[in-house]
């Protein structure tokens, strides 16, 4: 589980991550995104999305189911089809006392192709940082910062349990 504090409101970050149609606008690896089913009402429900990605010489497509729960500030993504044998990720957004957000992000994946798996394993940490960085940069464009730049959120870390990494 990657855990970080971002100086944006949890509702704004939930909105950003749930806005999958705009991923190609700010995540350079995603070249296209198409929502094939949308059963979301008032931030609750699920949608299916087909993504096209490109990294160096690799071009792939995959489909995921995105489950949104705005009241809980939770997003879960599960794999439907494509080059993986598994893909899942979770986002949890926790409000801190100054209005900023403690973000918990967890991802698990495995490619069917062992060469692709080996390539991604070598850069796993870098890939996660890239993804988080893309969302953080887009949040900076869309939303104004909240909270204190030097907030000590040590106590909040004790109060907010780390989500389990099992799917």
Please provide the spans of the model-predicted regions.
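Short, well-structured hydrophobic secondary-structure segments
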Residues: 45-51
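Alpha-helix boundary/capping detector
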Residues: 30, 39-43, 75, 92, ...
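Generic recognition of short, well-ordered alpha-helical segments
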Residues: 18, 88, 118-119
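Hydrophobic ligand-binding cavity/cleft-lining segments
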Residues: 1-44, 98, 145, 156-167
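Hydrophobic-ligand binding "helix-grip"
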Residues: 24-25, 32, 37-39, 52-102, ...
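Hydrophobic pocket/interface hotspot
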Residues: 13-17, 23, 49, 66, ...
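Terminal "cap-and-tail" regions of soluble proteins that handle hydrophobic small molecules
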Residues: 3-6, 95-167
């Amino acid at each position: 589980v990657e855990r970080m504090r971002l100086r944006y409101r949890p509702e704004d970050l939930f909105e950003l991550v749930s806005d999958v149609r705009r991923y190609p606008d700010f995540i350079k690896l995603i070249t296209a995104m198409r929502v094939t089913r949308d059963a979301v009402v008032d931030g609750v429900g699920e949608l299916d999305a087909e993504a096209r990605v490109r990294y160096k010489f690799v071009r792939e497509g995959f489909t995921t189911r995105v489950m949104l729960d705005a009241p809980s500030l939770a997003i879960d993504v599960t794999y439907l089809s494509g080059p993986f044998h598994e893909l899942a990720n979770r986002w949890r957004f926790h409000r801190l006392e100054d209005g900023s957000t403690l973000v918990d992000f967890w991802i698990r994946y495995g490619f069917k192709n062992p060469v692709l798996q080996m390539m991604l394993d070598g850069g796993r940490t870098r890939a996660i940082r890239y993804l988080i960085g893309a969302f953080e940069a887009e949040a900076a464009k869309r939303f104004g910062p909240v909270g204190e730049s030097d907030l000590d959120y040590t106590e909040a870390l004790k109060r907010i349990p780390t989500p389990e990494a099992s799917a």
